[in-house]
């Protein structure tokens, strides 16, 4: 059996707990710690039941054990407001930080677009936002064919899937996502909108992507590029589905998506969680495989987590 890279989860909320389930079935990652601030949180209880060490004393409760437990990678699923300090403390101990907050201290990563181009020596990688992970691949699919003058994304998510951390970071969400639409998606100007839908029963994550190309769009080439990108995202998020499009109207290209989650921690309507945590796990597996010098792929099935 291949040895595994040990990792820690910081944040015991929706995102951290969903990520836990994905890491438990990894071939190259071994979650050994979960950090929270609420001793009664469901996430800490689930982590402890899965055999992880847990602390409710925040990041400072983990630091004394980092070296002894050989933690090499940490995932921060807390808040943009505290991420910088979390990252500084762990980076000083040689831990690579994968940031699931909108803090955007390190370079952005959207796996099918730029994962392979990331510098191996960076110590902080930002996973943009759930809306960014869902929509930026589509902006990139268009911009890889021809120049995109303006890219606008609208991410609609179920209210039940949005925890307190995300609600506190709405402004950071829109700024960070818009920036990544430009930097990673390739649009000259980007805009991001998030809609938190209170409908019951909860709806699946839905995303709309508008791209304004500089020239008349090459409909055949853009359509082929979009379908190819959909397949790449589906390798780690099987519920990522093109519902309509690309629809062409003059220079405007519109794409409609739906994202269904695996139902690891929250129900399947929380595709916004699933695409974020799956992207983070995929990124960490790439880092771990380089540390171990092995080839690997993310196991996306649920059953292995409980085996």
Curated annotation (Swiss-Prot):
It is an enzyme of class 1 (oxidoreductase). It holds the Pfam family AcetDehyd-dimer. The active site is at 130 (acyl-thioester intermediate). InterPro entries: Acetaldehyde_dehydrogenase (IPR003361), Acetylaldehyde_DH_C (IPR015426), NAD(P)-bd_dom_sf (IPR036291), Semialdehyde_DH_NAD-bd (IPR000534). Signal peptide: none annotated. NAD(+) binds at residues 12-15, 161-169, 272. It comes from the Bacteria. The keyword Oxidoreductase applies. GO terms for biological process: catabolic process. Its EC number is 1.2.1.10. SMART domains: Semialdhyde_dh. Coiled coil: none annotated. Keywords: Aromatic hydrocarbons catabolism, NAD, Oxidoreductase. HAMAP family: Ac_ald_DH_ac. Belongs to the acetaldehyde dehydrogenase family. This is Acetaldehyde dehydrogenase.
């Amino acid at each position: 059996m291949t040895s595994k890279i040990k990792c820690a989860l910081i944040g015991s909320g929706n995102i951290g707990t969903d990520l836990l389930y994905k890491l438990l079935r990894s071939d190259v990652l071994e979650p050994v710690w979960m950090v929270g601030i609420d001793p009664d949180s469901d996430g800490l209880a689930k982590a402890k039941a899965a055999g992880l060490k847990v602390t409710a004393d925040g990041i400072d409760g983990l630091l004394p054990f980092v070296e002894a437990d050989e933690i090499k990678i940490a995932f921060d699923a807390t808040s943009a407001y505290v991420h910088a300090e979390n990252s500084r403390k762990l980076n000083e101990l040689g831990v690579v930080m994968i940031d699931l907050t909108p803090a955007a201290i390190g370079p952005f990563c959207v796996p099918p677009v730029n994962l392979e181009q990331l510098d191996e020596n960076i110590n902080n990688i930002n996973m943009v936002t759930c809306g960014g992970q869902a929509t930026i691949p589509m902006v990139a699919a268009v911009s890889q064919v021809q120049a995109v003058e303006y890219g606008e994304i609208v991410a609609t998510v179920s209210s039940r899937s949005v925890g307190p951390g995300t609600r506190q970071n709405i402004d950071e969400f829109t700024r960070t996502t818009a920036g990544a639409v430009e930097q990673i998606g390739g649009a000259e100007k980007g805009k991001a909108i998030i809609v938190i839908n209170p409908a019951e029963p909860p709806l699946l994550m839905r995303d709309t992507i508008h791209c304004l190309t500089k020239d008349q769009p090459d409909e055949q080439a853009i359509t082929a590029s979009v379908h190819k990108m959909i397949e790449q995202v589906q390798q780690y998020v099987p519920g990522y589905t093109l519902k309509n499009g690309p629809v062409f109207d003059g220079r405007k290209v519109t794409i409609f998506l739906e994202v269904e989650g695996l139902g690891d921690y929250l129900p399947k309507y929380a595709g916004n969680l699933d695409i974020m945590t799956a992207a983070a796990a995929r990124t960490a597996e790439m880092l771990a495989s380089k540390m171990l010098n092995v080839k690997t792929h993310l196991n996306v099935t649920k059953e292995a987590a409980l085996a």
